[in-house]
């Protein structure tokens, strides 16, 4: 069942024009509001970033008519490794449309756009930049995985920052480790942070780790252009 999509937008600090666009994608069963605290923490480190926090495309829960049910980007009902990729591919054009629209509205180019996703939202972010190489300059994916690892010859222009809990029992750290190896083999800039005592959660420490990696990546890219 589809739902009306709600999108929260927050501009940069008043004295800062929007130099970056950060799009936050929530976990399955949550909603856009669940990512707003993380969005504000990121803006504390990046005051010139415009924040966009959309809700998933479909409702999640047993009573889909209830206003209290959560949202999801693609259905998890009957989800398997065999059908996961097809379900994601079905919604990727809408993800691209959403991000392109926000880039136009905020006048921020793709190379200064960052997708920040948790769990299902992180998977959608990873698959989006795999499908559309020029969609965003970076991805920060928390407790997430590729539906299908990038294969030899895959073009990916985004910097990828993976943050994962060492004790994640929902999405095993093995997925993040495999993703990091595959990306490194494609010469894609990638970082992997395993927080050993963390389960499947988006904590303050994880947010700080991801935002720091993002800041370091932006600095390194700027430094490279000066040489």
Task: Report each predicted region and the residues it spans.
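Short beta-strand/loop motif that positions the catalytic acidic residue
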Residues: 161-164, 168
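Short beta-strand immediately N-terminal to the catalytic nucleophile in serine-hydrolase-like folds
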Residues: 115-117, 142, 163
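A conserved short beta-strand
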Residues: 134-146
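Serine-hydrolase catalytic machinery in alpha/beta-hydrolase-like enzymes
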Residues: 2-108
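Gly/Ala-rich beta-loop-alpha elbow adjacent to hydrolase catalytic centers
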Residues: 116-121, 125
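Conserved alpha/beta-hydrolase "acid-adjacent" motif
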Residues: 34, 169-175
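C-terminal catalytic histidine-bearing segment of alpha/beta-hydrolase fold enzymes
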Residues: 174-227
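Alpha/beta-hydrolase fold nucleophile elbow
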Residues: 107-117
